């Protein structure tokens, strides 16, 4: 698996981000969706990666810098054709390693509280993320859970 920085201009990644946003809208009320669109993902504080096997897109993930010691996991998504193949594990490990390389002391994330997000919550727990309260600009929301990992 080749995980590389992505400029978000290729048709495959545009389609996957569209699938990601559509999935969020099916499982969460609009006011509780914190997924970023393509324009937002291109902001300077976000590094975005895509995972490939030869010419096939497997998944994606991003790291947002909140401040010099705190990062946020964003836009974790596995292609529906590659679920349960370890793609998300590889991408999350890559993000954690990059956060450590940058010297972050804390890595946080927001994900959904509904059943559809249970696999994501389990993955984050396996990687040592613990439940916490809202961070950065987030507010309490019954459709969101917040997790953090000390690095």
Predicted regions located by residue number:
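Conserved GNAT acetyl-CoA-binding A-motif
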Residues: 99-112
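Conserved acetyl-CoA-binding loop-helix of GNAT-fold acetyltransferases
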Residues: 78, 84-97, 122, 126
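Acetyl-CoA-dependent GNAT
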Residues: 3-70, 74, 79, 92-93, ...
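Short hydrophobic/aromatic beta-strand or adjacent loop that forms the aromatic wall/cage
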Residues: 46, 142-146
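Conserved beta-strand-loop-alpha-helix junction that forms the acyl-donor binding cleft
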Residues: 109-120, 138-142
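Generic structural signal for conserved hydrophobic packing positions in ordered secondary structure
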Residues: 17, 73, 107-109, 117, ...
């Amino acid at each position: 698996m080749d995980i590389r920085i992505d400029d978000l201009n290729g048709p495959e990644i545009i389609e996957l981000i569209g699938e990601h946003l559509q999935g969020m809208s099916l499982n969460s009320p609009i006011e509780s969706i914190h997924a970023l669109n393509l324009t937002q993902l291109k902001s300077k504080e976000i590094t975005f990666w895509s995972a490939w096997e030869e010419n096939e897109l497997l998944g994606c993930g991003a790291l947002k810098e909140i401040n010099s010691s705190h990062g946020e996991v964003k836009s974790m998504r596995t292609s529906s054709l590659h679920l349960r193949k370890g793609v998300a594990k590889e991408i999350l490990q890559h993000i954690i390693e990059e956060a450590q390389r940058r010297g972050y002391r804390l890595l946080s994330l927001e994900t959904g509280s509904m059943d559809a997000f249970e696999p994501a919550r389990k993955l984050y727990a396996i990687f040592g993320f613990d439940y916490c309260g809202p961070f950065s600009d987030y507010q309490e929301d019954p459709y969101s859970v917040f997790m953090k990992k000390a690095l």
